[in-house]
Amino acid sequence: MESIEKKEIRPLFIKERIAVYVYCYSYKGTRQLSKFGDVVYTSQKSNYSLLYVNNENLSDLLSKLKDLKFVKKVRVGHIKELDQNFSEAFAQTNLAVKEEIERL
């Protein structure tokens, strides 16, 4: 039997992605949005779609989306900008609750 050559396993690089909310004039145009990123959610009633796109080419993509005829406005998600360390908030809330209990 031939010996099996060991191939080098390349690491999986996770690209940074960001949420983009695209508000449309009608529901018909939302099918075309899959060209620009991964369509995660589409609302027929509110006429908006949620896309996830790579963070690298965000500025070019936003200008392309705004130029489409059926697009009303484009918003970028801000979850990366928020502080996701909630331990301090919990500690402050616990102190406030303890102070209220002591007052009673």
UniProtKB/Swiss-Prot annotation:
Primary localization class, coarse: cytoplasm
InterPro entries in the cross-refs: DUF2129 (IPR016979)
Keywords: Cytoplasm
Pfam families for the chain: DUF2129
Record localization: Cytoplasm
Gene Ontology CC annotation, any one: cytoplasm
Similarity-based family: Belongs to the UPF0298 family.
Protein name: UPF0298 protein YdgE
Organism this protein belongs to: Lactococcus lactis subsp. lactis (strain IL1403) (Streptococcus lactis)
Lineage of producing organism: Bacteria, Bacillati, Bacillota, Bacilli, Lactobacillales
